[in-house]
A protein has these predicted regions:
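Active-site metal-binding loops of divalent metal-dependent hydrolases
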Residues: 14-15, 150
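Short glycine/threonine-rich catalytic loop with a Thr-x-Gly-x-Asp
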Residues: 252-264
């Protein structure tokens, strides 16, 4: 691919609407000792797989987003903000299903609460078949496919298998083990997800040393050529298999509260 060519990317997975409710609190409620927040502004943005799609567009890719939404106001708002971001929308509307919505309450600049509305119900058979048909058409012309699996019900075994032949498959999943049979090019778990993969529990230990010691096992369990593990503000650790096997460089980065990489 030439340097001037646009990357064709397909993002498939669990889409959601992220909302931030901004306000200030200067008194307590009469009915309970809780602050009364005066709502001053609301900010809506693509979340989950939709956020990944918007980020890829911002990096210069041409993106097609495949996923599931409900026939509700939240789904309509998600499509609106995706269009503003320049994302190609291929979202299947399932009547009676609720679009995932995460609301963050920000009081005087401080994140104080998050309210989630989600639907983890099994996809109807017709919806799975339609999703598979849309994926087949989308993946055929893609340079890269990104799967965002946050447990929202999109990735049935059949949908995962349909992505096994993708030209370059990158997986961001809360549970990466089910993706092993797809042999992804890369998976992007956070530290806690890697610990669960290894059968342990996250504790107050040296995270970098722990991940480095288990690098080969992590690659084996995921079936991926590359594993990129996010460590919040500590940075990112890269595990690579093959001729260039090893553990990559870790760099620090600033994480804004409420917008971190593990906030899905």
């Amino acid at each position: 691919m030439g340097t001037d060519e646009v990357i064709e990317a397909v993002v498939v997975g669990d889409v959601m609407l992220d909302s931030w409710l901004h306000g200030s609190a200067k008194r307590l409620a009469q009915e309970a000792p809780v602050p009364v927040m005066r709502l001053e502004a609301t900010e809506d943005a693509p979340g989950g797989a939709a956020n990944t799609a918007a980020n890829l567009v911002a990096l210069g890719a041409r993106v097609r987003l495949v996923g599931i939404v409900g026939d509700d106001a939240c789904g309509a708002e998600l499509e609106r903000v995706l269009r503003l971001a320049g994302v190609g929308i291929d979202l299947l509307t399932v009547p009676g299903r609720r679009t995932a919505h995460k609301r963050r309450l920000v009081t005087s600049g401080q994140l104080t609460a998050r309210y989630d509305e989600e639907d983890h119900g099994v996809l109807p058979g017709w919806a799975e078949r339609e999703l598979l048909a849309r994926l087949a058409g989308a993946v055929a012309g893609a340079d890269v496919v990104v799967a965002c699996d946050y447990g929202g019900g999109v990735f049935t075994p059949a949908v995962r298998r349909a992505l096994a032949g993708a030209p370059l498959l990158v997986v961001d999943a809360h549970a990466v083990a089910p993706w092993r049979e797809c042999a992804p090019a890369a998976v992007l778990p956070n530290y806690e997800e890697v610990v669960r993969l290894l059968g342990g529990t996250a504790g107050p230990i040296d995270r970098l040393s722990y991940l480095t010691a288990h690098s080969e096992r992590v690659l084996e369990l995921t079936g991926a050529a590359i594993v990129v593990t996010t460590l919040d503000g500590e940075g990112t650790l890269l595990h690579r298999s093959g001729p260039d096997a090893g553990v990559g460089y870790v760099w620090e980065h600033h994480v804004e509260p409420g917008r971190d990489l593990a906030a899905v």
